[in-house]
Amino acid sequence: MVKNETSCIRFSDRKICPSCGSNHVIKNGFTGNKKQQFICKSCKKRFIDYYTYKAYNHWVNKSIIQFTKEGLGIRSTARILKISTTTLLKRIISIAKNIDQPIISKGKTNEVDEMCTYVRHKRNFIWLVYALEKESKSIVSFNVGKRTNKTLRRVVETLILSEAKTICTDRLKNYKFLIDERLHSVKRFGTNHIERKNLTLRTALKRLNRKTICFSKSMVVLVSILKIYFWC
């Protein structure tokens, strides 16, 4: 006979705040489910003695970031953390909204390239355009959309505003209309680093792989996953 028990995650057996570790905790009424609620007088955050649903655990967001950067899919992450896929998708979007784009250093050489993926089905091509700083190998800007000047312009303009020393690209004609000749470089081996980064991305994130059954169902989720992978 299988015994059905509710798995409980104890937060405050010793009445210690799970957010800041302070012991200045007092009772603060009850929740709708009649569970005792506490409030920390130090950080002013509320919590209850235990949570029956693991999505409320304070380390879940850190695990979501870690698993996303390791390339796990939505269902794999939800299965390991024992939370629903709907909750996971909402958390991923929420985490991404709180991530700020890094400040771009002035006078640097940057490489720009585009990578093809798709959303919902393989006929709906979507392009990831991003810029990589040549010295630090870090992603400084990216955009997702159709392969048009509008999509490319958002990335290129951030580099121009940062007073980039050189912007290296491939021979895609669109760049000629967006980048000044004095900044633009299309020399051989000029995009070696970003081409290698493309391979890393396709290996790490299955949704970017060419031959795969994994795909993005939503543009919002795709952008959120990329923000977490690049800047978190």
What are these regions (language model features)?
Residues 1-232:
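Residue-level recognition of single "structural anchor" positions
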